[in-house]
């Protein structure tokens, strides 16, 4: 009986940690918001198109980012253009 209680509490702790992490790091969620990206001295409005963390966006993959330039998505935050 104690084993089952300990197992259940461990599961609850794991789920709560995952929920807290997701709430504190909105960059891990899919984002469809527009924002400004500074590139070569001008402001370019773009849409975040990297879907998963550490995913590389390529024009061939149908995931344009930074006006069609390749980019990398960090764990937290916006896409980083490779120019």
From Swiss-Prot:
A GO-annotated cellular component: extracellular region
Task: Report the leader peptide range.
Answer: 1-23
Q: Where does tissue-level expression of this protein occur?
A: Expressed by the venom gland.
Q: Which domain of life is it from?
A: Eukaryota
Task: Give me the segments passing through the membrane.
Answer: none
The entry's propeptide annotation covers: 24-48
Q: Please quote what the entry notes about the protein's domains.
A: The presence of a 'disulfide through disulfide knot' structurally defines this protein as a knottin.
Primary role: Inhibits TTX-sensitive sodium currents in rat dorsal root ganglion (DRG) neurons.
Q: What is this protein called?
A: U25-theraphotoxin-Cg1a
